[in-house]
């Protein structure tokens, strides 16, 4: 009989958020694949579970897959956990699951915590439709390219960011979305010093500038989606500018476009320069 691969969600901060089913699964498994065995040991010690731990992370996943599949095909039951939250969600494991499915092996979800969903649920920003991006790119140019695509979305946007790039990313968001754009920064969700910051991007920027000692760990940023009317207006601006720029100066094109749409001249000028390049 073939073994089963369990995708086990773990707490994102408060260890007591572990589910009973997750505990039962980890207690009755042949071995556990952990993103970081040191982090996993702390959780297992808290739960009083002794288990055979092996690492599976972004650096060794492809190398480990054949070995793991062999164990599964031999009848071993295996659990995959990440450092926190649901495995595969901005964490390793996708390639393993993909290959397990190809081998017709059973992959079983053991649901639980997710920082993205926890943050969204308390953000006060619409939850009916949302777009999860994950971690933004490390370099400014690539990050701006992504943000320029995200700003067009009507859905609520969820992104993760690390402590080292948080301030830079917020500044980039202000550049693309505008400082008054509705947004909430969620830090240390489910932990003792859990905090939700800001009503807009400018408030978040000011908080980070005034509280450098609080910039620790990983963060979730929830951004309000763009209204349909704004998207339609942007498309109209692009259409007008694309017709005018080949035949008149930027200044004249901006003036005509502003009169036609009633839109802010500065924003139209910025867009005109982007189209002109």
Describe the residue ranges of each PLM region.
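Glycine/small-residue-rich loop that forms an oxyanion/phosphate-binding "nest" at active or ligand-binding sites
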Residues: 68-114
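Class I SAM-dependent methyltransferase SAM-binding "motif I" and its flanking Rossmann-like core
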Residues: 95-153
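A contiguous loop/helix-start segment that scaffolds small-molecule binding in enzyme catalytic cores
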Residues: 2, 156, 160-277
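Conserved helicase motor
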Residues: 56-62, 136-139
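Alpha-helix capping/helix-boundary segments
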Residues: 38-40, 85-86, 115, 165
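Loop/turn-to-beta-strand initiation segments
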Residues: 3-5, 75-79, 155-156
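Short active-site oxyanion
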Residues: 26-32, 105-108, 156-157
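Glycine-rich, flexible N-terminal cofactor/catalytic loop recognition
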Residues: 1-59
